[in-house]
């Protein structure tokens, strides 16, 4: 939301580094890389609702610190802490959906849930641009504080626990108290102590990421495309102000095609994903998670993603009318959402018993590249490659990853049967 004000911040804090300019935006995503490692195990021990409420409070407090920042270091630190607290719904949101939704409705539910964290960076800069011009960049964060302060009590009273092991343990504890029988145990209770459970859970996302080839390669695909997305996000301000003369108030409109593209990708992905599951159920076929990786959808999405990068890069370099690179961005964003939603739905069902840990593993790699790849974006575009070959290079890298969903569509079930993590399903 404050991306349109980057140039204003650089002037106020006497900064000239292009790396600092992009890092001010992307460091928030770096918080998403580390937060899930703590949030995922805690959610599997204490449930989802307490973490949502604590995360909301901490996020609002850290946003106050961001608004009061007096130098670049302070601003970067509080932006990172905002990302840590903001990672709570990103990490356990899909787990809550898995807790509540039937299998045939999860695709649409996942799509609806994804709209928040993905449309935020698209719609936010539009409102932020006009707010920054009218009141300065700090009011972006004061507005977030006001909204957060209003939502905290609403969430506290309205959110209910959904995680089955925690709910069953609470019921068991109540029955122990009512019956006086200390030997009653939850069917889902673990024999491990809280410390042992936490230790096992905190290592699980990294074990999944390192030792599960399905999660490793799928996460890598999503992470690279997500990193490219944030390379575009963090450079839009410089591209559209420098090449097309957009002002502080109108620069946010450059992010609008990303939102439109994501809406298209999410809508199509959710519809097709649930439709194929319902069709298979109607035919009496056994559901397998691999059907979420529809080859006739994920492969075209992968190719369109590359095409969008080529269109954006070369039309910016040749100074074609600004609407044309925006069309390229729209195509790219529609395609990336198709891929991300298919992959996330697949991984969630393939490792359902460890949904929070799988989401954490996916978030760690995705957020690391989302935060770090943009640091070299301006240098890439200012090199001999410029926008044309620079974005073409990114497109060719993405092209190499296109077959990954198809590989696991064919061989995923065999690999899952060999997985020790999958036995809990």
PLM region spans:
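A six-helix transmembrane bundle that forms the core substrate pathway of small-molecule transporters
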Residues: 1-425
